[in-house]
């Protein structure tokens, strides 16, 4: 897929080195087609890393995408250069009159706080509500998935005794859904979280379908509104060394952390990770773009309701 990204976004050069086809705005404007408009609300601390991880996975269909990045007015990022935020991110207030074919809302390092204590809770729930009438399909990832399920359906989260950390085996509960087209019977997903949601709470809500889960890591994906919303508790977008970085960071800080499970070759942190999730991560995002965004969105984007 040719990705239409803001000129000079750092991810452009990083992904070109991986032989991924990206174009900047100036080249895209010469192509006489309507690109799909995708907005990413990036709540992760290391924003450039997350941008690159997501854009990498959005690059595997023949569709042209126009990627925009949203930020919160009520929260200031402390780990990303101000110049980068000014150059590539826009406040929700400046974007709220736009319509988008797809939206991705990332995780955030606030999962151990009560939702209402998060300093941007009011703003982000406003965005959740806005997305229902301004976006064709939205992916909620990790904390955003928990927060969305709580906001819309009252599904609570629960603290874990030990961090869910590693690569876990999953299975599909609902066969035949386009989001899983091409998936194997079992597939692997990275998880890195201190809280969980319980399948029993999902099953109580008639508007939700629990479509994939793990015997080890629990709920993985719930779907609502016929695919206009997906709530995903894992991190299929993670690059090979993300868990390694988290593990060694916490070790260096003296924090209690177990080695990520099913991750390093021979369970030896001196060895490289064994990537078991790349294929299904690519399928997940390409299936979402094709079947739930491109196939469902109106040509006249203003008709999104």
Swiss-Prot record:
The record marks 111 as: Important for acyl-CoA specificity. Its main location: cytoplasm. One of its GO terms (biological process) is L-methionine biosynthetic process from homoserine via O-succinyl-L-homoserine and cystathionine. It is found in: Cytoplasm. The keyword Secreted does not apply. Substrate binds at residues 163, 192, 249. This is Homoserine O-acetyltransferase.
